């Protein structure tokens, strides 16, 4: 019974909700376990109602006059709330900042490989920091770094948006790209469509107790060959 799960302070509650004997008001407006309005009751009578059902009296609106309380299984309520929070956390997308480093004169094959990586990062809803590293005299040719970053922007225009424009920081020129919202929405739409199509593609199972389909009729046996008159002589 829920009434057995109260803490030593006089009621199974938490800091955000008073329960049972922790409720300080002398009278409260009570909502029943099924959501029915029970009216304004003295606190002892409200507690008795909850105890009769093996449930808790929970103060859900302490600032009301009088406070509003609801009869519920508070232990189960807290369990379900925590379960919902855990499920929500699992669904949350944790955005990470991934970095890809380039040079002012990056070889074509290396460039293509790294652009492919950036596409993967963005498709996973992560952000990407594109950094151009300068060495020695390359610092006097910063326009090469700008050309590299501009090329990246053009090559990723379909999947990325600029979150932080190119800028210098020491011997590095970098920018930050974020996933294009249209691309992410398109991915979600495709996933929903695939999920909806999956059950339809599966063959329907026969209903329980339904007779098995009749076997296809066998092919007729071939007619015997006519005797050769020459062979009979």
Swiss-Prot record:
Biological processes per GO annotation: ribosome disassembly
Stretches for region Disordered: 1-21, 184-233
A GO molecular-function annotation: ribosome binding
Pfam hit, one: IF3_N
InterPro entries attached to this UniProt entry: T_IF-3_C_sf, T_IF-3_N_sf, Translation_initiation_fac_3, Translation_initiation_fac_3_C, Translation_initiation_fac_3_N
Pro residues bias (residue ranges): 212-223
Ranges of Low complexity composition bias in the record: 193-211, 224-233
One term under GO cellular component: cytosol
Subcellular location: Cytoplasm
Keywords: Cytoplasm, Initiation factor, Protein biosynthesis
Subunit details: Monomer.
UniProt similarity note: Belongs to the IF-3 family.
Role noted for this protein: IF-3 binds to the 30S ribosomal subunit and shifts the equilibrium between 70S ribosomes and their 50S and 30S subunits in favor of the free subunits, thus enhancing the availability of 30S subunits on which protein synthesis initiation begins.
Protein name, UniProt field: Translation initiation factor IF-3
């Amino acid at each position: 019974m829920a009434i057995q799960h109260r803490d030593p302070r006089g009621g199974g509650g938490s800091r955000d909700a008073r329960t049972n004997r922790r409720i300080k008001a002398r009278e409260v407006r009570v909502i029943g376990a099924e959501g029915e309005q029970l009216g304004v009751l003295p606190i002892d009578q409200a507690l008795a109602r909850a105890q009769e059902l093996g449930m808790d009296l929970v103060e859900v609106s302490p600032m009301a006059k009088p406070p509003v309380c609801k009869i519920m299984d508070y232990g189960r309520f807290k369990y379900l709330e925590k379960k919902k929070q855990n499920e929500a956390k699992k669904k949350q997308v944790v955005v990470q900042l991934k970095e890809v480093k380039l040079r002012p004169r990056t070889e074509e094959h290396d460039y293509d490989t790294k652009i492919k990586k950036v596409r993967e990062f963005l498709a996973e809803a992560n952000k990407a920091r594109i950094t151009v590293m300068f060495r020695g005299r390359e610092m006097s040719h910063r326009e090469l770094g700008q050309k590299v970053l501009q090329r990246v922007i053009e090559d990723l225009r379909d999947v990325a948006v600029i979150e932080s424009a190119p800028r210098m920081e020491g011997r590095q020129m970098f920018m930050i790209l974020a996933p294009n919202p249209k691309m992410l929405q398109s991915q979600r739409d495709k996933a929903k469509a695939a999920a909806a199509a999956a059950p339809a593609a599966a063959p329907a199972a026969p209903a329980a107790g339904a007779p098995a389909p009749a076997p296809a009729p066998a092919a007729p046996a071939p007619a015997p060959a006519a005797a050769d008159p020459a062979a009979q002589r």
